[in-house]
Regions:
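Short, small-residue-biased leader/transition segments that mark boundaries at the very start
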Residues: 2-8
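Charged- and aromatic-enriched interaction segments used to assemble
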Residues: 9-52, 56, 215-321
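Terminal (often C-terminal
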Residues: 47-144, 203-209
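An acidic/polar, Gly/Ser/Thr-rich interaction patch typically located in mid-to-C-terminal regions
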Residues: 98-101, 253-320, 327-554
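Extracellular carbohydrate recognition and processing domains
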Residues: 152-181
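Noncatalytic modules at the cell exterior or secretory-pathway interfaces
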Residues: 176-199
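Proprotein-processing/basic-patch segments
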Residues: 199-221
């Protein structure tokens, strides 16, 4: 959870609403999504996923068949499929000698093409080959019967004539094109693929370090998911904290962050498509999420909670000027505001899929360069934003398994509802993402860990001046709009400093705006400060005790 919300608070006047929030902020409530959802659902149009068939060699030594007088022959390389990770199927299938004829009875056949993957089909293949005498070649070939006539071709780049006795031939090709998405290759549907070696007579061949995979990108069918607007959830939480009575109002100043006006919340159970889906959350979770992701904090007054940009609570005009000559003048560094480490982002999730390695909505750590403490400032969102997490949940629709790890989680996504549209659509416009497999379909780029620092930069800049990227629990090779997610960051515009000033003054006049600046003049220095706390006794004229957070000294 966010430590920031506990770090620096102006002392709010304790209204009944403030007292209720204080008492019940951590209580977790559950609500039926059907009671809070938007009239129109999100059209979740899926992530492109990598699908991989891996093949291994069945036998690593091949001997030229004896008793033949041919000058050379084709020797089949037997391969078998192992550990496929197939997310969207029905394009290719492993296929072996017993599955049908290929040159009568060929053992080197390993797969058949059933349909054309829309983004192409590719192969990576590497191995080391030694031959006992003479020379030879190594080849991947495809064939199908068309009207009783075999149509045969060779995979470009897979043919090598470099085998010769006395040396190891290192074969290594990546991205061999089996189906080119830029061409009409419908004639390849039904092809079977085979690997063989062509050698002279009487040889022994050894193949080692064999690695082969065939892969393609594809996505599943779009699904509709119910979503909830942040202010609707906020008002439902206020009603729960008020014993199910109306009377309290929650508002969000959407206009100060364009990302927020296109944010919707999604329950994990909604992503799963479960009947009677519920969302589980608390006011603290909601508040921490708003603070971490958008830099918004709750402003509580009377019977209203307004979430607004933290910076808007620090007013720039000077409300009061004090010329101070008294003795009770204490400036000290508030050590609770000093950190050696900044953690930002989201809790790490474990996926059992190679695709999940691309996810970058996890935790980034930055070194502040401060060595006098080992404290960390954590800005970790309690709501999740990981696209792969949503994709894996949606892919479980129709399956009865429970995913205890994440069924109670809540997600949020950037989505907008265009005029007259029947669904919310994911926002991808304006965000160019690289360093990721599914760059064209990834979403939530606007909520990367780096964006959290941007949303809170004046606040974080009050404690540290520069952040050196240390590590990421996710994919740190990501670039968003050509900015690397793992760049160091300089912070130049702090809200305040880590020093406080305490004074007691006989001047009993209270500033009318407690969020405005107070200037204190002493010994020809001018201390410009925000009010942390002020104490005065109503009806007893004993002056005012100020606890001030210094913004600048000049």
């Amino acid at each position: 959870s966010s430590a920031a919300s506990d770090v620096y608070k102006r002392q709010a006047i304790d209204s009944t609403l403030a007292a209720k929030i204080k008492a019940k902020k951590s209580t977790q409530y559950e609500y039926l999504v059907s009671e809070l959802k938007e009239e129109k659902a999100l059209n979740y149009d899926r992530l492109l996923m990598l699908n991989t068939f891996n093949f291994d060699i069945d036998n690593d030594e091949y001997i030229y068949p004896s008793g033949t007088s041919q000058a050379n022959t084709n020797i089949d390389v037997y391969v078998v499929d192992t550990n496929p990770e197939v997310y969207v199927g029905d394009f290719i299938t492993p296929y072996h000698e017993s599955d049908g004829a290929y040159y009568g009875n060929t053992k080197g056949v390993f797969m058949k093409l059933l349909a054309l993957p829309p983004h192409g089909l590719y192969m990576d293949l590497s191995c080391d080959i030694t031959i006992s005498s003479g020379t030879g070649s190594f080849q991947v070939e495809y064939q199908k019967m068309v009207g009783g006539v075999p149509s045969v071709g060779s995979v470009n780049g897979s043919h090598t004539s470099g085998l010769k006795a006395g040396s190891v031939y290192h074969y290594n090709e990546k991205g061999l094109v089996l189906v080119d998405p830029t061409k009409n290759e419908s004639g390849k549907i039904g092809m079977v693929y085979r690997i063989y070696l062509n050698t002279e007579a009487g040889v022994r061949i050894k193949i080692e370090n064999f690695k082969m995979s065939v892969y393609y990108m594809a996505k599943m069918q779009p699904e509709r998911i119910d979503v909830i607007k942040p202010d609707v959830l906020l008002n439902r939480l206020l009603k729960s904290m008020n014993e199910e009575n109306e009377g309290y109002v929650g508002e969000i100043e959407y206009q100060d962050d364009t990302r927020l006006s296109s944010t919707v919340i999604m329950a994990a159970e909604s992503a799963r498509g479960l009947d009677g889906a519920k969302i589980y959350t608390s006011f603290k979770n909601f508040s921490d999420w708003m603070e971490v992701v958008y830099g918004y904090v709750p402003d509580i007054a009377e019977n209203k909670v307004v979430f607004k940009k933290r910076t808007s609570l620090f007013h720039s005009e000077v409300q009061k000027r004090i010329s101070y000559t008294g003795m009770d003048f204490k400036v000290k560094v508030n050590s609770s505001l000093i950190y050696s480490l900044l953690r930002v982002g989201y809790d790490k999730q474990d996926y059992d899929s190679i695709n999940g390695r691309d996810e970058f909505h996890f935790t980034n750590e930055y070194d502040t360069g401060i060595t006098i403490t080992d404290k960390a400032l954590e800005l970790i969102s309690p709501l999740r934003a990981d696209p792969y997490g949503i994709e894996f949940l949606v892919s479980k629709r129709g399956k009865d398994t429970t995913d205890n790890e994440s069924d109670n989680d809540a997600f949020f996504v950037g989505a907008h509802l265009k005029e007259n549209a029947e669904c919310y659509e994911l926002v991808r416009e304006g965000y160019k993402v690289s360093g990721i497999i599914s760059s064209s379909t990834i979403f939530n780029a606007m909520f990367s860990p780096r964006s959290i620092i941007e949303a809170n930069k004046e606040y974080i800049g009050s404690f540290v001046k520069s952040l050196r990227f240390a590590s990421s629990s996710g994919n740190s090779d990501i670039r968003i709009n050509d900015v690397a997610e793992n760049l160091d960051i300089e912070l130049t515009d702090p809200l305040f400093t880590v020093s406080t000033l305490s004074i007691s003054t006989a001047d009993g006049g209270i500033p009318s705006d407690v969020n405005a600046l107070v200037e204190v003049e002493r010994n020809s220095l001018l201390y410009t400060c925000f009010i942390n706390e002020l104490k005065y006794k109503i009806g007893h004229y004993e002056g005012v005790d100020y606890n001030l957070q210094i913004k600048s000294i000049g």
